[in-house]
Amino acid sequence: GNLYLTLSGATEQEHGWYKNLKPGESFTTVPAGAAVVKGGLNPAAAALTRYRRKVRRPNTDDEKLNVVFNDYMNCLMGDPTTERELSIIDKAAELGCEYYCLDAGWYDDGFWWDRVGEWKEASGRFPNGLKEVCDHAHSKGLKMGLWLEIEVMGVACELANKLPDDWFVCRHGKRHIDNKRYMLDFRNPEVRKYCRDVVDRLINDYGVEYFKVDYNVTMGYGSDLNSDSCADAIREHYECLHQWYEEIFRDHPELVVENCGSGGQRMDYGMLKILSLQSTSDQTDYLYNANIAANVASAVTPEQGGMWVYPYEDEEHVIYNVVNGMLLRPYISGMVWKLGENSMNRMKEGISLYKEIREEVRDGVPFFPLGFGTMKSEVLAYGVKAEKNTYLSVWTPRTTEAVIPLENAEQIRRVSVIYPKEEMCGYKIENGNLVVKMPQEKAARLFKIEMK
């Protein structure tokens, strides 16, 4: 039979996009990648993963797969203070994290949502200055990170009300407002310079080596200012944004920038060919996070997929959380000051193991032995095939037994549970399947499969 593939957009009819070309001008659409393979989902996912790695900017973060602690999710939730940060930094260092990212709230003493935009430390939160916190992180061997939403200014930001309208996305002579924010228009070179100065200042003043760049808004169908069509203003904004990032990395090649947008938005390789890490969710429930962990490597390379790990209850809860992140990029958070000794040790074990296998995660390709999981799935499974070994995460959110089909089962030399190290479950290979008996529902284990 025949296979027909149609790619379209942006168009005027569907997207309100058009661009007028003068004689001699040309226009090239954004690139799109498609995998054409023999086989099904897994060969296609492998091919797309290799393609994404090939088009991506070479960077040390995606070579090292740094472990990041972020103080937001199920942790401080945007309410930082010096006292809180210092104690959490100590815990992050003890766990074996390599970066510490101070998330939202560091720039305002009160309700900060609609006042973002100047990116200056809040003296009420940090009486001795933000540098005290950054210096403490550095003293513990951690590289320091800060949260930014660099493309917006809140409607209550004093600076925003002093700036001309052409700094912002506008329609019908007024600034577009979404979620109490104005959107900066990166087509304006003054905007790009201002934002670059912010980044350079934070790097120079605080020793920041990591930015989590969020985007909790949408500019809708674009701007009618200085553009053929509103939608083309969106395209031009993103082209300028990408160029802005490329210029930053030319001057700061070791800087790490995480791509975030209310969790996992803007997860495209226009952004991810430049930025090394992608936030995949703002999901606060670790059980639902497993559904994301089991599927997300279809859309992002495993080493770029930041997955929240935020344990705060019993041992199986800790294990489930850690397994969520083990074959992606574990992104540590949670109320770590409440963890007992056993839970801390279980977390340390997971992070230490991740450091042992992360080069194989970096070089391997994802596979989905049960296909894509759904919210109703009783069993979830996701794996990474590396050159020598295969790693497989298995979750049982609604059952205690899992049956996972294995490719080339007759060639398997050994299967073992590598997290947790005590195993604490039953398993065997039977009729070409890995059969797992968990100690309870809502359990997870990480397996290593070695071939003959």
Regions found by a protein language model. Give the residues of each.
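Flexible loop/turn segments at secondary-structure boundaries
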Residues: 36, 40-41, 75-78, 92, ...
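Aromatic-lined carbohydrate-binding/catalytic grooves of carbohydrate-active enzymes
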Residues: 64-197, 210, 220-222
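Generic structural signal for hydrophobic
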Residues: 88, 92, 137, 202-203, ...
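N-terminal accessory beta-strand-rich subdomains and adjacent acidic, glycine-rich linkers
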Residues: 1-57, 287, 366-369, 402-451
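Conserved, mostly hydrophobic/aromatic
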Residues: 24, 137, 195, 214, ...
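Short secondary-structure boundary/capping segments
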Residues: 116-118, 162-163, 227-228, 272-279
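Active-site-proximal substrate-binding groove within the catalytic cores of carbohydrate-active enzymes
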Residues: 241-427, 433-448
